[in-house]
Structure formats: C-alpha cells, structure tokens
C-alpha cells in the first residue's frame, strides 16, 4: 500500500503477484517485474545469491526479523509467549509448494529441510490462513502479518531458533 502511495501519481500500472521464490527471481531477471520481494537466511543465502549474481540482480535488505510461527487463535499453543521446535512436533506444518524445478533452497519458509510428522503444502495465502484457523497447523514466518489479512483469528508467536530472516527487494 505504501509503495503504491509513494510511487503512484497521476497515472500508473502496478501488478502485484504472490508467487514462488524462483519464479519471482526469474520474473525480475526477464523484466516481467521491476522488483521482487524475497528473504534470505543462513541456509538459502549462498544458493539464492548465486542465482541473483547469474541473473545480474541485486538484493537490497529492507529489514531483518526473528522467526515466528503463525497459528490460529484456537491452537493449543495460542497462550504461549514463545515456542520451540519440540513444541511443534505434533502439529501440522503448513508450507508453500515450490513446484517441480525448485529445491528446498527456494522454500518460502526457513527450516525447510526439517522432517515433519504432519505436513500440508499449499499454493496460496488464503488456503494457508484457512488451515491455520481450521486446524492446529502452523507456518513459520517473519512475524509480520497485516491485521486486515488475519483479523483476530491468526496470532504470531516468537520461535526459539538461532536464525534471522532478512527480507529485501531484488532489482536490476
């Protein structure tokens, strides 16, 4: 919203898409998009930076955040101030599907290589929100979720892991 307000003016055309990490990089590389928003962490940084270099793209960090989980307000962990990975073992892990050609380095979530007893992959934000509110499922993210998207139904709880999520834009 702030980007549209800041860049708007008398006439403009914005196309805002939610997509897979690899597709976002390729869209900017092939000039289908002027910029993309992705994240880096210690696990994916080398592979994504290599892909960005090969694509003549630059990552500019906007901010960094400690990981959080998003859960529905009726989740058994909803009253906790913090959670750790052991607390999540019996709950469904909700992640974004990345397609056939993409490795786990292009995952939308950190800690993507961990095995989960229960796992559900989705392709869109609406489905993941429905699953968070309708099951005991969780997803790992930056902790930033606009209130208009979640209302009071989704809550964010800090996750005790030694990881930092660096969110930024990619451009030429």
What are these regions (language model features)?
Residues 51-93:
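Flexible hinge/capping segments at coil-to-helix
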Residues 27-35, 39, 98-155:
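Hydrophobic hinge/microswitch elements
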Residues 52-60, 64-66, 126-172:
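Beta-alpha-beta core module
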Residues 45-46, 77, 85-114:
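Secondary-structure junction motif
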Residues 18-22, 56, 82, 122-125:
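Structural motif corresponding to alpha-helix initiation and N-cap regions
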């Amino acid at each position: 919203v702030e980007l549209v307000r800041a860049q708007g003016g008398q006439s403009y055309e914005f196309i805002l898409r939610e997509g897979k990490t690899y597709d976002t990089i390729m869209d900017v590389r092939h000039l289908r998009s002027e910029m993309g928003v992705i994240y880096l962490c210690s696990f994916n940084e080398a592979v994504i930076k290599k892909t960005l270099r090969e694509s003549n793209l630059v990552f500019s960090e906007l901010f960094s955040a400690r990981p959080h989980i998003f859960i529905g307000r009726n989740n058994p962990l909803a009253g906790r101030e913090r959670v750790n990975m052991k607390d999540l073992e019996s709950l469904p892990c909700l992640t974004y599907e990345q397609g056939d050609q993409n490795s786990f380095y292009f995952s939308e979530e950190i800690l993507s290589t961990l095995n989960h007893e229960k796992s559900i992959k989705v392709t869109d934000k609406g489905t993941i929100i429905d699953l968070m509110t309708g099951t005991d499922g969780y997803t790992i993210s930056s902790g930033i979720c606009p209130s208009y998207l979640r209302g009071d139904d989704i809550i964010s709880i800090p996750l005790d892991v030694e990881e930092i999520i660096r969110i930024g834009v990619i451009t030429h």
